[in-house]
């Protein structure tokens, strides 16, 4: 039976590195709130529990991780099987929450290593792998060019985040105004109902007193 766990939910950030534990065939997910047209880079590494040493090994040989990325509209942006460590990429098509899930692809490790895994995950928003690019640079000019390009991308990402936050604030303001307007109209409708009921009761009592010749 497949188990799915939502680990955490956090808003837009440039980088989030952490680790978590997972069991046999247990799918664990995180939720990222991402602006549209944004590159996401995820790097992961799996460590296997050693029941003899009572510690995690440096790797998990023979094990793989199945990575899926979906939106809340059930649009699949990524669905791929990787090894015990790897890097995945995807680009958001629209603003909003994106669900990133990881699941081990085998249960063979249970018989010799226990059912516990430690998964290290580093999520980077709007960033390319600058270090790898610099290593491949042939001279200082190329290195400076890569760094400058990286800086430009960061500035563009900050501007994109600001636009996204402004859009969220505008949507929240519109929702709040609509809610306040609905509350005001409902209060006005209640007042009209109370006045109508009062007039009806007064007329009913007046007719009753006249019929009984009390007035």
Curated annotation (Swiss-Prot):
UniProt cross-references to SMART domains, sorted A to Z: EMP24_GP25L
UniProt key word Signal: yes
Annotated compartments: Endoplasmic reticulum membrane
Residue ranges of the motif COPI vesicle coat-binding? 208-215
Point out the signal peptide segment. Answer: 1-17
- Glycan attachment positions: 105
Q: Name one GO cellular component term.
A: endoplasmic reticulum membrane
Q: Where are the transmembrane segments?
A: 168-185
The GOLD domain covers 27-125
List the stretches on the Lumenal face of the membrane: 18-167
Q: Which domain of life is it from?
A: Eukaryota
Motif COPII vesicle coat-binding, residue numbers: 208-209
Spans within the Cytoplasmic topological domain: 186-215
What's in the keyword line of the UniProt record? Coiled coil, Endoplasmic reticulum, Glycoprotein, Membrane, Signal, Transmembrane, Transmembrane helix
Its membrane topology, per UniProt?
Answer: Single-pass type I membrane protein
Look up the coiled coil feature and give its residue ranges: 136-171
Q: Which family does it belong to?
A: Belongs to the EMP24/GP25L family.
Function in brief: Part of a complex whose function is to bind Ca(2+) to the ER membrane and thereby regulate the retention of ER resident proteins.
Q: What PANTHER family does UniProt report for this protein, alphabetically?
A: TRANSMEMBRANE EMP24 DOMAIN-CONTAINING PROTEIN (PTHR22811)
Q: What is the protein's given name?
A: Transmembrane emp24 domain-containing protein 11
Please name the source species: Mus musculus
Upper taxonomic classification of the species?
Answer: Eukaryota, Metazoa, Chordata, Craniata, Vertebrata
Gene transcribed to yield this protein: Tmed11
